[in-house]
Amino acid sequence: MPGQAGRRRLVGGGCRGSQGPLGGAATMLRSLLLHSLRLCAQTASCLVLFPRFLGTACMLWLLDFLCIRKHLLGRRRRGEPETEVELNSDGDEVPPDDPPICVSDDNRLCTLASLRAVWHGQKLDFFKQAHEGGPAPNSEVVLPDGFQNQHILDYARGNRPLVLNFGSCTUPPFMARMSAFQRLVTKYQRDVDFLIIYIEEAHPSDGWVTTDSPYSIPQHRSLEDRVSAARVLQQGAPECSLVLDTMANSSSSAYGAYFERLYVIQSGTIMYQGGRGPDGYQVSELRTWLERYDQQLHGPQPRRV
């Protein structure tokens, strides 16, 4: 009997020992398969993105010729529809929601830094999880006070729409349209919640530099750097809640928000997805959505027959 028990122990130990190498090989094979699939996905995305990236690069190269730049930007301004002049309570003219994008003559657009930034933005847009009509990603954000981790949907309250405004201080269109965004906050905050999410710098002083940027801020190396930059923005947007994207840029990646972008979330669903900045960043589109929502909410109810 003792001999049989010893033999059984040897047989059991031998089986476990033989399964060890097989289990390790299976784990290695599974890991190799995942890496291969990830590589195939990256390769496929590069093939899909490259034509668009090449077109953008050619456009930036052409815009470095001042005669072409002035002609194209001037034609774009002339092609924009004239908006009705709006007056404030003091009778002064209110600036337009989307002032034209200005590019100074001394700014080069086609550089290695600019191409890297364009590729980064297009890749984030391609892989984003957020799509109009779909579920809103509940990505992580950080409070500037205390560095407490929260999630975007923590700021959604019941059935109230939540407006997300992604951007940074070194992005000229984002800063130029901040006053228009603030007017919307003041007008609709009774029924709508607003949240600014400070993301990585669009034009850092150690990256794609532009003299049109109102501030000179380097790339964020830590959350402390991002907080310091966000404080500058917070001074100009005191009525709106502000949070930071994580240093892994989880929210910017989930929403494809680089360089800047606008979203509206309601009941966990993306109701409005603005275009990717700079060209697609249109506060006037957000205003139109809010006006329609306000009309549905407070407009006359149809009479029952």
Swiss-Prot record:
It is a single-pass type II membrane protein. Its EC number is 1.21.99.3. The chain crosses the membrane at residues 44-63. It is an enzyme of class 1 (oxidoreductase). The keyword Membrane applies. InterPro entries: Iodothyronine_deiodinase, Iodothyronine_deiodinase_AS, Iodothyronine_deiodinase_I/III, Thioredoxin-like_sf. Residues 82-96 have a biased composition (Acidic residues). GO terms for biological process: hormone biosynthetic process; thyroid hormone catabolic process; thyroid hormone metabolic process. It is found in: Cell membrane; Endosome membrane. Expressed in brain only. The active site is at U171. Residues 79-98 are annotated as: Disordered. Keywords: Cell membrane, Endosome, Membrane, Oxidoreductase, Selenocysteine, Signal-anchor, Thyroid hormones biosynthesis, Transmembrane, Transmembrane helix. Residues 1-43 are cytoplasmic. One of its GO terms (molecular function) is thyroxine 5-deiodinase activity. Pfam families: T4_deiodinase. One of its GO terms (cellular component) is plasma membrane. It catalyses: 3,3',5'-triiodo-L-thyronine + iodide + A + H(+) = L-thyroxine + AH2; 3,3'-diiodo-L-thyronine + iodide + A + H(+) = 3,3',5-triiodo-L-thyronine + AH2; 3-iodo-L-thyronine + iodide + A + H(+) = 3,5-diiodo-L-thyronine + AH2; L-thyronine + iodide + A + H(+) = 3-iodo-L-thyronine + AH2. Residues 64-305 are extracellular. Monomer. Homodimer. May undergo minor heretodimerization with DIO1 and DIO2. Plays a crucial role in the metabolism of thyroid hormones (TH) and has specific roles in TH activation and inactivation by deiodination, particularly in different tissues. Catalyzes the deiodination of L-thyroxine (T4) to 3,3',5'-triiodothyronine (rT3), 3,5-diiodothyronine (3,5-T2) to 3-monoiodothyronine (3-T1), rT3 to 3',5'-diiodothyronine (3',5'-T2) and 3,3'-diiodothyronine (3,3'-T2) to 3'-monoiodothyronine (3'-T1) via inner-ring deiodination (IRD). Catalyzes the deiodination of 3,5,3'-triiodothyronine (T3) to 3,3'-diiodothyronine (3,3'-T2) via IRD. Belongs to the iodothyronine deiodinase family. This is Thyroxine 5-deiodinase. The lineage of its organism: Eukaryota, Metazoa, Chordata, Craniata, Vertebrata.
